[in-house]
Amino acid sequence: MPSQTTLKRARQAARQGKRPTTQAGEFVREEMEHIRQGKHGARSTKQAIAIGLSKARRAGIKLPPPRLGQVSEKTRQSAKSAYRAGQTGQHRKPSARRSRSTLKALKREGHKAATRSALARQARAAARRRKTRSAASKG
């Protein structure tokens, strides 16, 4: 469950007319904080970002799932169901056993995913994949 401050910041960004990706960024930032604080870990920076985006979609941020061919079909379906859950407002009570096992698995993972160097590496790689709008993609 996202914290109240994260929800407040995301709503404020929405009021200011910011893009859904900007609003979702708050949830990703919170996820990185959780990893840094040691609440849990993540296998990779990509996984940490994915968790944040999923939470954003479930919280009702209008961030559509990625298009066909961008990511694996499993990821797309997961994003689709998270998006649908956030938009309909109907939430089933999460299974305690499933939540516990997920958290337990994440606790076993490392904390390197949220370091400055890991985030910088991820940002550079993402910029390189973009065809336009970045110096990194040109270099």
Feature map (PLM): residue ranges:
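A charge-rich, low-complexity, intrinsically flexible signal that marks solvent-exposed coils, linkers
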Residues: 1-139
